[in-house]
Amino acid sequence: MVMKKLLFILSFSLMSFMTLAQDVVVIKHTNYTTHFSKSKKYPVMVQWETTNAMVTCPTPLKRKDNFKPDPQLPVETNIGNDYVKSGYDRGHVMPAADNLCQTPQIQDECFYFSNMIPQTHRLNAGDWKSLETATREWAVISSKVRVWSGAIGEEKKIGAISVPKQCWKVVQIAGKWKAYLFNNDLSNPDGFDNNEVPLAQIEKLTGFKFR
């Protein structure tokens, strides 16, 4: 009886892993790699490095909000109209400002929908943006930071897109780790530093291992 139960659990876990593997598409762009969920229509994880040279230059590019489908996943990411009048921002995972000292092509890649999460404006323009700014400052100080970021869960749908319950970010700075978890609503405490959590909590929630 115990053996049958164990085999059932192992079989269920394997099926869940296979389903996830079939759903998530990994796409490599110049400055970031996105793990895009075809069912949720948002990236469960995006990973990149931000360096001092990427964010400090005498003539940074002007931001162009050229949101568009990812050419490597055109059908699944042709979701721009779903954001219209939805009440949610097209929240960057890898920030556009991390590419202002790059080429126009690299900046354009940052506006693919495979790098977007539906976020409340309060989060996107508030603590999420403040954490993005802090991460760039850490990159200047330490010359480079490694970043993993994404979303989990489903609060509701806007068109075909799942609105995630939570957004998270992990930053490695000179061998030290920082992890942050935000609810995608109005319930977060003010200040991104007040949303710092143990790295193990992010690993448990997402299933990703960072160390």
Residue positions per predicted region:
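Short, His- and charge-rich active-site/binding loops that engage polyanionic ligands
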Residues: 27-89
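Sec-dependent signal peptide hydrophobic core
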Residues: 7-14
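Domain-level detector of nuclease and nuclease-like folds
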Residues: 71-211
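N-terminal signal peptide c-region/cleavage motif recognized by signal peptidases
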Residues: 16-18
